[in-house]
From Swiss-Prot:
GO biological process: chromatin remodeling; DNA repair; regulation of transcription by RNA polymerase II
GO cellular component assignments: NuA4 histone acetyltransferase complex; SWI/SNF complex
Function: Chromatin interaction component of the NuA4 histone acetyltransferase complex which is involved in transcriptional activation of selected genes principally by acetylation of nucleosomal histone H4 and H2A. The NuA4 complex is also involved in DNA repair. Is required for NuA4 complex integrity. Component of the SWR1 complex which mediates the ATP-dependent exchange of histone H2A for the H2A variant HZT1 leading to transcriptional regulation of selected genes by chromatin remodeling. Component of the INO80 complex which remodels chromatin by shifting nucleosomes and is involved in DNA repair.
Name of the gene this protein is made from: arp4
Pfam families documented for this protein: Actin (PF00022)
Residue ranges of coiled coil: none
Record-given protein name: Actin-related protein 4
Amino acid sequence: MLIAICVQDEISAIVLDPGFSTTRAGFAGEDTPKSVIPTYYGKYTYEAQEKLIFGDDIFVTPRPGLSIHNPMGRDGVVEDWDMAEKVWEYSFTSRLTGPKAGNPFQNGLNDVANGELPSEMEGVETEEKPLADSPLLMTECGWNPTKAREKTVEIAMEKWGTPAFYLARNGVLAAFAAGKASALVVDVGASNISVTPVHDGMILKRGVQHSPLGGDYISSQLRALFKTNSPQPITITPHYLVASKTAVDAGQPAQAKYKTFPPDKAPDASYRTLMEERTLSEFKECVVQVWPGPNKLSATGPNGVSNEEVAKSSPGRPFEFPDGYNQVFGIDRYRVVESLFDAKAAIPDPESVFPAPTQAQTVPELIKAALNGVDVDVRPHLLANVVVTGASSLLYGFTDRLNQELMQSYPGPRVRISASGNTAERKFGSWVGGSILASLGTFHQMWISKKEYDEHGPNIVEKRCK
């Protein structure tokens, strides 16, 4: 009996944090997710059969006709449930639980020569479910609709067979990760920016704001910049299309040998777009910088000199593209992100999938709208606990600029920003919060058990996971 109790305590819950760009999964109580995979998946046809590829394998080989898809919508709500389920399942079976054994009648213990089952095994399921031993905590955005929440608990209980389940809001978990029960959480992800007021561990729904100006929007601004770049427009050639290259001086045309694929062997255009996105991510990490303030980039600084002049005089940053073309980027590296704070600064691009941003979609305005949606008495407390999270918030200078904007808008109350200096914690804020929450002894009473789910149906998630 004692052994059974010890073993039971060893079972760790799994925390699953699905995003638009990546899906994070790991064991509760650990400080980073063991599994971080792209939420994108690949589809191609081989010998007249449709094949699917998940995880980092989508980057490896440009297979003929390989097309890239994403089951999530840009608003953070699932659009394709069948594929979302497969991607999520891959995230934990590939690194955490391992695929479960198939048919229990052919596992060496219960082999039946003629396929006849012993009568006492008639009702046994033919396949063990992937989460039969692990409770599951999943995250969701603050505006996830009821239908989507119910579908999530349904998949976890019925398809994966989890014994206990909980669905937690991203904003609340990011606040917990920063050690706060009340906070104003600014989450800058790949597909959107959200501002979530959290009070005593609950989100204040009327104050939740979000806009589509996330990391992918910044990538689209980079594409617009490269089209109008001088001395020459820049074409991004992904690594898989470069056979060899020769070093060239900055600003000189690339000297590279390119790979070509015959039409029947070439991957779909969506594969190239995904690979270009990897170069753009590298560019954002190495070059792009947020104008630190005070005031907008287009305004005049406190000393009477225009901010653009100051930006031009600061040293540039070099970057080399996969085909060997390289250039030093000056003021342009500030311009591509300025529209997160000033919509008028957006670089126009008629071909972009993103419409021109409005001022209401910028970070300072989202924060203003979020604070206006909550009780006046709570506002100073939220401003003293601003938590910044999300991978795109790692842009150089982002928190400095946010601090300047908030001090200008709210000179009275004390403004304090908490942004983890640890890259992993900032990228995986809501996962870390989920890991902390699911490993607390007092959290046991919060789980929705399989028994409760069977009694009340998927609607229980609305009552229990507020």
